[in-house]
Amino acid sequence: MIKVAINGICGRMGTRIAELVTEDKNLILVAAVENQKHQNIGKDLGQILKKELRGVVISHELREKPDVLIDFSSPDSTVERLKTCTENRIATVIGTTGLNMKQKECVKKATEKIACLFSPNMSIGVNQLF
């Protein structure tokens, strides 16, 4: 079973990915991460997904060690989580948009140490050209 964490859990993409992860028997959601000032910090993810409570509490910190972090957050949050992922050898999928050149350089540097997919536009057509 693959352990998954999602950064940006309360956004549209984060919520949708969480729904898909919870429906897949080969995946287990172990961490739900969001901006520290978000109103849902401390709530069980089940409240957000409107499903039975799952025991995954929304936090600002990545407390669990997942196999992969899926990130659809903000540029600053992405870079912060990427440092944690690099230090702990956690594979990362980044779909965050709006990264500046310095932040993109952090992503590039991380790829030297961990598996990292960076695609700020996840549409099939764009990724065939990317």
Regions found by a protein language model. Name each.
Residues 14, 38-42, 55:
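A glycine-biased structural micro-motif
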Residues 10, 14-18:
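N-terminal Rossmann NAD(P)H-binding glycine-rich loop of SDR-like oxidoreductase domains
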Residues 1-5:
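Extreme N-terminal starter segment of soluble prokaryotic enzymes
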Residues 69-70:
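N-terminal Rossmann-like NAD(P) cofactor-binding module of classical short-chain dehydrogenase/reductase
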Residues 52-66:
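Short acidic low-complexity segments
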Residues 23-49:
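NAD(P)-binding Rossmann-fold cofactor-contacting core
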Residues 81-88, 95-119, 127-130:
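Rossmann-fold NAD(P)-binding glycine/threonine-rich loop
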Residues 9, 73:
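NAD(P)H cofactor-binding loop motif with strongest signal on the N-terminal glycine-rich segment
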